[in-house]
């Protein structure tokens, strides 16, 4: 389900979770639309398409393409942790304020109750065990369109950890057989991460 975005979309629909509608090439009537590989990751080969001519070009470039309606709104990543029985322990949504090559370089924790509720529904339906990362777009009228589930820690999971998620400590507790409960109370809402590119200089003669 999680490795094929077509199956992921059908799964979301089956449990009452909003997701962008998939559109066949011949049925595209309005623009913009969004195109990407149905088995891709990050932002590789992912494009907003604004007209028919561009779509006809991108459909030949993008491998294993899937076309969906374009949803305008705030992008979110949700860092999640479940125990080995599928019980949810942490759900930490964060806004993707600035993105480079599919990875957030500026992000802020937002403990949005609706996102947390929908994410818990997804995790419980999938019976996810361990770490997972869920992507969605939240519109201005508070509709939440979920787009993918990745069964791993995200590239910026350190924000969830730094804000109080303590994923590593909980995994150690799980390995020791301790029973844990869902707990977001230690997470700092609004906590911000900014990533910088650092340059280091070395003199080979010294």
Predicted regions mapped to residue ranges:
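ATP-dependent carboxylate/phosphate-activation module, predominantly the ATP-grasp catalytic core
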Residues: 47-53, 61-63, 68-132, 138, ...
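Non-catalytic, C-terminal membrane-associated alpha-helical segments of glycosyltransferases
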Residues: 197-206
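Residue-level detector of family-conserved "landmark" positions at structurally sensitive sites
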Residues: 21-23, 133, 183-185
């Amino acid at each position: 389900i999680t490795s094929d975005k077509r199956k992921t979309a059908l799964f979301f629909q089956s449990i009452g979770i909003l997701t962008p509608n998939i559109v066949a090439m011949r049925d595209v009537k309005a623009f913009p639309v969004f195109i990407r590989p149905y088995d891709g990751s990050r932002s590789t080969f992912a494009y907003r398409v604004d007209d028919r001519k561009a779509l006809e070009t991108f459909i030949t470039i993008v491998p294993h393409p899937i076309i969906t309606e374009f949803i305008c709104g705030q992008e979110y990543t949700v860092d999640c942790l479940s125990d080995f029985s599928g019980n949810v322990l942490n759900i930490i949504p964060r806004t993707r304020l600035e993105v480079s090559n599919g990875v957030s370089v500026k992000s802020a924790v937002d403990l949005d109750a609706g996102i947390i509720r929908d994410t818990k529904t997804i995790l419980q339906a999938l019976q996810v065990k361990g770490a997972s990362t869920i992507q969605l777009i939240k519109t201005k009228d508070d509709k939440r369109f979920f787009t993918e589930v990745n069964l791993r820690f995200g590239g910026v999971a350190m924000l969830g950890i730094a804000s109080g998620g303590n994923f590593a400590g909980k995994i150690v507790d799980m390995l020791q057989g301790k029973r844990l409960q869902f707990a977001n109370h230690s997470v700092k809402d609004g906590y911000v991460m900014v990533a910088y590119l650092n340059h280091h200089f070395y003199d080979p003669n010294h």
